[in-house]
Design a protein with these regions (language model features):
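C-terminal and inter-domain tail/linker signature
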Residues: 1-159
C-alpha cells in the first residue's frame, strides 16, 4: 500500500492543478524521506536548496533536512510516517501526520503527532516549513509531555 492510499482525508480542489501536484509532491517527499530511507534524494527533489526551516532543531536548506532524516533512519530504521489528513490551498500544504519510531525503537511506540505546513513554489517544491509536534499518549498517560499518569478526558484519539 502506498502512502497516498493511506492518507485518510485529502482536501484539494481538483481543478487546482498546482494544489493537486503540491499534495502529490509532499506525499512523495514523506514516502521517500522517511518510509523508503531516501531522505537526501527526496529532499533534493522536492525542496529548494534555500528551503527555510522553522523547526529549531534543523538548519535551513534541503541538504540539512535530508541529513537530519538520514540520521533518524540510521538511528531508528523502523521510523515511519503515516499521513492522516492532507489539505492544499493555494501555495500551502497542511499535513496531519504520525511519526512512529522517530525517537525510539519500541515496537509499541504510539508516535509523535505532527502538523506540517509547507509553502510551495510555482515548480511544486517546498520553500518553507513550519511544524507543531506532540507525543502521542495512551489511555493511562494521555499527556506524556506534561506529566506521567494523566488520564484521558475523552476517547476521541489524536487521529
Amino acid at each position: 500500500m502506498t502512502l497516498k492510499a493511506e492518507a485518510g482525508i485529502v482536501l484539494v480542489d481538483p481543478r487546482d492543478h498546482h494544489a493537486v501536484r503540491n499534495i502529490d509532491n509532499v506525499l512523495t517527499l514523506y514516502q521517500m524521506m522517511i518510509n523508503e530511507n531516501k531522505a537526501e534524494e527526496g529532499t533534493a527533489k522536492f525542496l529548494t536548496r534555500d528551503y527555510i526551516q522553522h523547526n529549531p532543531l534543523i538548519a535551513d536548506g534541503s541538504a540539512s533536512l535530508g541529513k537530519y532524516f538520514a540520521g533518524v533512519k540510521s538511528a531508528h530504521p523502523n521510523a515511519q510516517v503515516v499521513v492522516h489528513r492532507i489539505v492544499a490551498v493555494g501555495d500551502y500544504v497542511f499535513a496531519h501526520v504520525n511519526f512512529v519510531n522517530l525517537l525510539t525503537d519500541d515496537p509499541n511506540d504510539k508516535g509523535v503527532a505532527g502538523v506540517d505546513i509547507y509553502k510551495m513554489n510555482t515548480d511544486g517544491k517546498a520553500i518553507e516549513h513550519w511544524d507543531a509536534l506532540q507525543l502521542v499518549g495512551n489511555s493511562q498517560n494521555s499527556a506524556p509531555w506534561v506529566a506521567p499518569d494523566i488520564p484521558r478526558a475523552n476517547s476521541n484519539g489524536m487521529f
